[in-house]
Regions:
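Ligand-binding clefts/hinges and TM-proximal coupling segments of bilobed small-molecule sensing domains
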Residues: 33, 170-179, 183-187, 226-228, ...
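Periplasmic-binding protein-like
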Residues: 54, 137-145, 220-257, 279-304, ...
Length: 312
């Protein structure tokens, strides 16, 4: 498969073999005259466009050579392989298009980008504008604290000073938990994630409440990564991340869903997760040390595109 602008030199060796995907659009196969929507466009142009993020570690970001890498980016490359096989193409050019939080939905909706590979939350509001494939990650609100403090559960935080970033759902959640569970917390707002983590680092707060994957990245990037622990207990239900594609394009979604379901249920899916969340990653070799949670294991064993946290 050929990569377009900002292309990676070669596909990862771990790319799912086309034959392993075994995807068809029905008994008669994907003949050109039967195709509609995105599949028709890809067949006619010989191109698929992947949207990537520049700094959504470890999902989709630029490495030291300014090339897109990441967990979600690898999944999108595997989807592209499945599409190539399904359409019986000898060559498929993968074009790479940068997206941001602001541009990702419009660029999917207007046809510029076919797959958005990042850390996009699948929720009901977004489903009115775009579609999502099977969930590839679940985040939840947790807290990071120094291991030496032994703050293993939310109850252990009683009477402590904690910090969260102002204007986030996370600070609202810790305020609600404080009231509901009579924790007697002092809750400080920080202007951004870096300031909040620094408050834990310097002892001005016992814990920082935020999305667990962001906490993992901050801890891994700190001066002493081994000095911090992220709570196993969560303050929120799991929030699913999914790869976006165009709404109301059932044939394309069927190919994408089958490709991701096969990947997630296979041993390779687990290896892919572990590569990006439990091992050193480029460019600085940080290790997020975020093993697969029980809800995440369930999301891989029974793939779902549901936006409902209760589904996980």
């Amino acid at each position: 498969m050929h990569f377009g602008h900002h292309r990676s030199a070669a596909l990862s060796a771990a790319v799912v073999l086309a034959s392993a995907m075994g995807i068809t659009l029905g008994a008669s196969g994907a003949n050109a005259q039967e195709l509609t929507g995105t599949l028709k466009k890809i067949k006619e142009t010989g191109e698929i466009t992947i949207g990537y993020r520049d700094a959504s570690v470890p999902f989709s970001y630029l490495d030291g050579d300014q090339k897109p890498v990441g967990y979600a980016f690898e999944i999108c490359k595997k989807i592209a392989e499945a599409v190539k096989t399904n359409l019986k193409l000898t060559k498929l050019e993968v074009k790479l298009n940068p997206v941001t939080s602001a541009t990702r939905i419009p660029l999917i909706a207007n046809g510029t980008v076919d797959l958005e590979c990042g850390s996009t939350t699948n929720n009901v509001d977004r489903q009115k504008q775009v579609a999502f494939t099977n969930t590839h990650f679940l985040t939840a609100t947790r807290y990071v604290a120094k291991k030496s403090a032994k703050l293993d559960t939310i109850e252990d935080l009683k009477g402590k000073t904690v910090v969260s970033t102002s204007g986030t759902t996370n600070i609202r959640q810790i305020n609600e938990a404080n009231t509901a569970r009579s924790l007697g917390l002092t809750i400080l707002p920080a202007k951004d994630h870096a300031e909040a983590f620094l408050m834990v680092e310097t002892g001005r707060a016992a814990a920082f409440v935020m999305d667990d994957v962001l906490l993992a990245s901050l801890a891994a990037s700190s001066k002493e990564p081994g000095a911090y622990a992220i709570s196993t207990e969560a303050l929120s239900k799991p929030e699913p991340y999914g790869i976006m594609l165009r709404k109301d394009d059932a044939p394309f979604k069927a190919v994408v869903d089958e490709a991701t379901a096969k990947l997630y249920k296979s041993p390779e899916g687990k290896v892919l997760y572990e590569t990006w969340f439990t091992k050193p990653i480029p460019p600085r070799g940080i290790n997020l040390s975020l093993p697969m949670s029980d809800p995440m294991k369930k999301a891989f064993e029974s793939p779902s595109d549901s936006a409902d946290p209760a589904a996980y």
